[in-house]
């Protein structure tokens, strides 16, 4: 006989403890609020101390801030251990923190230092977060590890070579960890966004102009991807409704990555 249970509306993470890296701004800050609204105790991890602490103070009880440079393993160890000491467990590790290229350029114009910076945060930082989350989840035989990747892992040209390789590493890590950690009841997934206007991506440009350009280029008309679209996708993967979902790259791009522009152009010419 099938059994079905549902958490109270708006409380899909009731009783859960979550760490969200890069949680002081952008996608991370929205995820912090949505996870908190859904009943989770949330630890914000970031290097933007004023923003992170201000968000924790705004949301109040059940939300705290810990400074953490995710490319520094000692910082990550402290983040996880402090969370477990405070709340007694860690249910969800959302490795969301990331950086983009200073200049969106070709491989010919990309210095080695830019590649190393992207790999250090986007790939190695996520690796370290997953490593130390798994360290405390394995004895409990359960847990959820999430990442933010990118739709550039699905279609060429959405990101620079350096950024793309750093995010491909995340998707590869998701698949590898899902295979390794499944025996311990730990699920591992990622969310891959299409372009969206955040403080990091706009870099002083009017967000409305960025959104207009992305909407014009995008496949799904009449909709604009915002941070809550990604945070809600992460919420689904984090909650018990996704209890048998692991090893997946949930691409949130309005169908952009499955579109063949050559075919669409030919179709328009014919008609």
UniProtKB/Swiss-Prot annotation:
At the top level of its lineage, which domain of life is listed? Eukaryota
Recorded metabolic or biological pathway in which this protein acts: Secondary metabolite biosynthesis; terpenoid biosynthesis
* Pfam families reported for this sequence: adh_short_C2
Which reaction(s) does its UniProt entry say it catalyses?
21-O-acetyl-isomeliandiol + A = (21S)-21-acetoxyl-apo-melianone + AH2
Q: Does the keyword Oxidoreductase apply?
A: yes
Q: What molecular function terms (GO) are annotated for this protein?
A: oxidoreductase activity
Q: Which UniProt keywords apply?
A: Oxidoreductase
The record's active-site residues are 150 (proton donor), 163 (proton acceptor), 167 (proton donor/acceptor)
Briefly state the protein's biological role.
Oxidoreductase involved in the biosynthesis of limonoids triterpene natural products such as azadirachtin, an antifeedant widely used as bioinsecticide, and possessing many medicinal applications including anti-tumoral, anti-malarial, anti-rheumatic, antibacterial, anti-inflammatory, anti-pyretic and diuretic effects. Catalyzes the oxidation of 21-O-acetyl-isomeliandiol to (21S)-21-acetoxyl-apo-melianone.
Q: Which family does it belong to?
A: Belongs to the short-chain dehydrogenases/reductases (SDR) family.
- What protein does this entry describe? (21S)-21-acetoxyl-apo-melianone synthase SDR
Organism, as annotated? Melia azedarach
């Amino acid at each position: 006989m099938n059994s079905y249970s549902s958490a109270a509306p708006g409380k899909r993470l009731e009783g859960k403890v979550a760490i969200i890296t890069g949680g002081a701004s952008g996608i991370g800050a929205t995820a912090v609020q949505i996870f908190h609204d859904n009943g989770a105790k949330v630890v914000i991890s970031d290097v933007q101390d004023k923003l992170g602490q201000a968000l924790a103070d705004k949301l109040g009880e059940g939300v705290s801030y810990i400074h953490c440079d995710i490319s520094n393993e000692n910082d990550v160890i402290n983040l996880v251990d402090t969370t477990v000491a405070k709340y007694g467990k860690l249910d969800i590790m959302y490795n969301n923190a990331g950086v983009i290229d200073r200049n969106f350029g070709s491989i010919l114009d990309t210095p080695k230092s830019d590649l190393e910076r992207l790999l250090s945060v986007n790939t190695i930082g996520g690796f370290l977060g997953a490593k130390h989350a798994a360290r405390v989840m394995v004895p409990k035989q359960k847990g959820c590890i999430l990442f933010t990747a990118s739709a550039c892992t699905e279609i060429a040209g959405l990101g620079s070579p350096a950024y793309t390789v750093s995010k491909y590493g995340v998707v590869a890590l998701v698949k590898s960890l899902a295979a390794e950690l499944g025996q311990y009841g730990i699920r591992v997934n990622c969310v891959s966004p299409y372009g969206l206007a955040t403080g990091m991506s706009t870099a002083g440009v009017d967000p409305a102009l960025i959104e207009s350009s992305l909407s014009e280029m995008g496949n799904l008309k009449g909709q604009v991807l915002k941070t809550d679209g990604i945070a809600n996708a992460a919420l689904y993967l984090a909650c018990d409704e996704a209890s048998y979902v692991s090893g997946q790259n949930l691409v949130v791009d309005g169908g952009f990555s499955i579109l063949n522009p050559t075919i669409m152009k030919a179709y328009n010419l014919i008609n």
